[in-house]
């Protein structure tokens, strides 16, 4: 039931009808707008990554330059990218392999028969893990001058060293902004859910109050949230029961 409808049926004050219906409309429209903004930024940062992160550059920098001296910067690491092969490589090894295959086959990137699958994991990994920092094309400038640098992050009981570049920093900031909008959209969804619960409780309470002088029977209510293990927040819906 749309929040405010129960109040209208019970002939509640207009301010109460407007409050519940207004919260509903504003929350839904705000959530949709924030999701739209998050998606636009996502498209932008993916295009940015497509133009500034390169598989051949990653292999070369990781294996042949000082950036590869860091413990977390190597080809065969904890995390992997999916590679798509074509031509003779695909005939021999199949269409898809993981990026650790390049540890012993770095020459593949020069054959023109291998590309990186730019899926959701790819766009997350290149910004999140030092292992892939060598793929950012601004690790070194035109004069082969070093442009990557260290950033120190306090993680409580220790300090984490992050290897980054100007482009990677920009990319991470864009992803963070997109995620901020998504989090705001989640809050809007929560506002809608709680607005439904409170509106329903108010409607039931108003019904009880209006009927009590006319009937000896008391109407008892039970309002609760339904658990759903497949739901992101564990909430599958709202349960409202009336007993008389």
Model-derived features with residue positions:
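Short hydrophobic alpha-helical membrane-entry/anchor segments
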Residues: 8-14, 29-40, 198-213
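Hydrophobic alpha-helical topogenic segments used for membrane insertion/localization
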Residues: 1, 18-32, 188-201
């Amino acid at each position: 039931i749309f929040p405010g409808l129960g109040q209208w049926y019970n002939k509640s004050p207009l301010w109460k009808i407007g409050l519940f219906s207004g919260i509903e409309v504003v929350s839904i429209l705000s959530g949709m707008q924030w999701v739209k903004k998050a998606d636009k930024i996502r498209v932008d940062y993916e295009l940015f990554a497509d133009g500034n992160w390169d598989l051949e550059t990653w292999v070369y920098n990781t294996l042949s330059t000082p950036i590869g001296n860091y413990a977390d910067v190597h080809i065969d690491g904890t995390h992997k990218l999916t590679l798509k092969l074509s031509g003779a490589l695909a005939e021999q090894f199949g269409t898809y392999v993981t990026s650790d295959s390049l540890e012993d086959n770095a020459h593949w990137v020069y054959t023109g028969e291998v590309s990186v699958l730019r899926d959701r994991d790819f766009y997350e990994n290149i910004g999140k893990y030092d292992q892939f920092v060598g793929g950012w094309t601004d690790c070194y400038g035109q004069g082969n001058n070093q442009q990557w640098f260290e950033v120190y992050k306090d993680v409580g009981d220790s300090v984490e060293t992050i290897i980054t570049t100007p482009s990677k920093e920009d990319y991470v900031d864009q992803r963070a902004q997109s995620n901020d909008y998504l989090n705001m959209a989640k809050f809007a969804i929560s506002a809608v859910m709680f607005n439904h619960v409170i509106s329903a409780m108010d409607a039931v309470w108003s019904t009880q109050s209006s009927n009590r002088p006319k009937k000896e029977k008391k109407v008892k209510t039970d309002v609760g949230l339904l658990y759903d293990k497949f739901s992101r927040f564990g909430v599958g819906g709202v349960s409202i029961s009336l007993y008389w």
